[in-house]
Amino acid sequence: MQLCVALDLEKKEDNLSLLQELKGLDLWAKVGLRSFIRDGATFLDEIRKIDGNFKIFLDLKLYDIPYTMANAALECAKLDIDMLTVHLSSAKSALTILMQRLNALKKRPLIMGVSALTSFSEEEFLMVYNAPLKTQAITLSAIGKESGIDGVVCSVFESLAIKEALGKGFLTLTPGIRLDKNDKEDQERVANAKEAKQNLSDFIVVGRPIYQAKEPREVVLELLKDC
């Protein structure tokens, strides 16, 4: 299991300062919408300057009509990133075209499809998708696998079921990881790193428990032990 550190701080300088503290550790730097829109593609180069071994996860959750989404993914791939997210509900046609385009490249990032955001409660998900959360997460994940993507973004609580349905080689990335599961904030389906590993998660995403800590590096070292 691998650790992705979410760079969601208010200022670019704060994100870079955090990475300076984590230099030399085996982790992924997750750049989301806020940081990418604010700081641009050059932010990725600044991450690499701190530690060239940091792997870069561009978490943009692309969702659009097929060719628009595929073209956007191609532009992202040109930034030499290691992982990119797209929405599974964009449908099989969009995902298939996207993967055809990316597979033509000499090197492409891992493509992870978002199934159900971890901010969804069971009730909210049912209202939007008119289906039970775990059932629909597996259905969407199957569409993703048929389209050729590498894996899915899901909560810890769907990870094992997705692995059992689609095989252990189909990757799962699980956000909503907390040190204290009572500390949900804007997440609903949270778990700790040990539970993520028990449910066969390949990647975990941790943000606030790291950057709100007095000693972020110590928190990351503890998390890496659980990985």
Curated annotation (Swiss-Prot):
Protein name listed in UniProt: Orotidine 5'-phosphate decarboxylase
BP term (GO), one: 'de novo' UMP biosynthetic process
Keyword annotations: Decarboxylase, Lyase, Pyrimidine biosynthesis
Subunit structure of this chain's protein: Homodimer.
Annotated function: Catalyzes the decarboxylation of orotidine 5'-monophosphate (OMP) to uridine 5'-monophosphate (UMP).
Pfam families on file: OMPdecase (PF00215)
EC code: 4.1.1.23
Gene Ontology cellular-component annotations: cytosol
Binding-site residues, substrate: 8, 30, 59-68, 118, 178, 187, 207-208
InterPro entries membership: Aldolase_TIM, OMPdecase, OMPdecase_AS, OMPdecase_bac, OMPdeCOase_dom, RibuloseP-bd_barrel
GO molecular function (one): orotidine-5'-phosphate decarboxylase activity
Protein family per UniProt: Belongs to the OMP decarboxylase family. Type 1 subfamily.
Enzyme class: lyase
Residues forming the catalytic site: 61 (proton donor)
Gene (UniProt): pyrF
Metabolic or biological pathway, per its Swiss-Prot or TrEMBL entry: Pyrimidine metabolism; UMP biosynthesis via de novo pathway; UMP from orotate: step 2/2
Catalytic activity: orotidine 5'-phosphate + H(+) = UMP + CO2
